[in-house]
């Protein structure tokens, strides 16, 4: 069995599969992904594989520069997005946006 390259919380699986979530915002530990990378995707909770994605773009962002567009790409409101990112990465301000599409 191949290992997964990236994981998402299970609550995001349906949005990813339906194309409603098209970016992920990560910290420096996952800043190495590049445009064109093809990644196996698993659930964070059990590492179960659920799809393959292709990275279509990467960029950097801070909590202060998150926009409504980022929130739309995450399928949530900007307020929700800022809270989710702050909860997952407490005390951090610099992040890496990974845009993707399901294959």
From Swiss-Prot:
Gene3D superfamilies: Hypothetical protein (2.30.130.30). It comes from the Bacteria. GO terms for cellular component: cytosol. One of its GO terms (molecular function) is N4-acetylcytidine amidohydrolase activity. Pfam families: ASCH. The keyword Mitochondrion does not apply. It is an enzyme of class 3 (hydrolase). The active site is at 21 (proton acceptor), 24 (nucleophile), 74 (proton donor). Residues 6-101 form the ASCH domain. CDD domains: ASCH_yqfb_like. Its EC number is 3.5.1.135. Keywords: Hydrolase. SUPFAM superfamilies: PUA domain-like (SSF88697). It catalyses: N(4)-acetylcytidine + H2O = cytidine + acetate + H(+); N(4)-acetyl-2'-deoxycytidine + H2O = 2'-deoxycytidine + acetate + H(+); N(4)-acetylcytosine + H2O = cytosine + acetate + H(+). Belongs to the N(4)-acetylcytidine amidohydrolase family. NCBIfam families: PRK04980.1. Catalyzes the hydrolysis of N(4)-acetylcytidine (ac4C). This is N(4)-acetylcytidine amidohydrolase. It comes from Shigella boydii serotype 18 (strain CDC 3083-94 / BS512).
């Amino acid at each position: 069995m191949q290992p997964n390259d990236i994981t998402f919380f299970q609550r995001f699986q349906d949005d990813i599969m339906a194309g409603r979530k098209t970016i992920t915002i990560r910290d420096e530990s996952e800043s190495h992904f590049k445009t064109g990378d093809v990644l196996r995707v698993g659930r964070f909770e059990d590492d179960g594989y659920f799809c393959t994605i292709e990275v279509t773009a990467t960029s950097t962002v801070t909590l202060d520069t998150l926009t409504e567009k980022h929130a739309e790409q995450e399928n949530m409101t900007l307020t929700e997005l800022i809270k989710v990112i702050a909860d997952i990465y407490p005390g951090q301000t610099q992040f890496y946006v990974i845009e993707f599409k399901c294959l």
